């Protein structure tokens, strides 16, 4: 067994995530809820993303996903099923940090997107099929595609 870390071995995906988050693919009919965070991508471009955030101590991943959806978008949702996990590296303070985000398929229950968090510039509904190609991050596009396949087998 090698003692190399995933980074040293050339892997793009971490073996043991040091940072864990949870998020939701919130659907209403054939529409999905997406956000444009105030924080821009590294190249300065706007980001189109799924709502997600850190799992607080003592919180379950599902609890975190529902809370983050509520905080970032202003809507309440209910669980349909789990969609899987996305793993990636990002940079914080010049260091590469491995991260894991578990995503859930959620159904819209109530709420107003105008009540979104101040860290979010915009919340909007868009066609789920369109989100599969237009979300900024590849892992989130894959998760949206899984949601579409789950809803329309």
Question: Which residues make up each language-model segment?
Answer:
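Conserved hydrophobic/aromatic beta-strand scaffold that supports enzyme active sites
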Residues: 25, 34, 103-105, 125
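Active-site segment of metal-dependent pyrophosphate-handling enzymes
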Residues: 74-111
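Short, charged/polar surface micro-motifs in flexible loops or helix N-caps
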Residues: 27-32, 40-42, 56-57, 85-87, ...
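The catalytic Nudix box helix
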Residues: 50-83
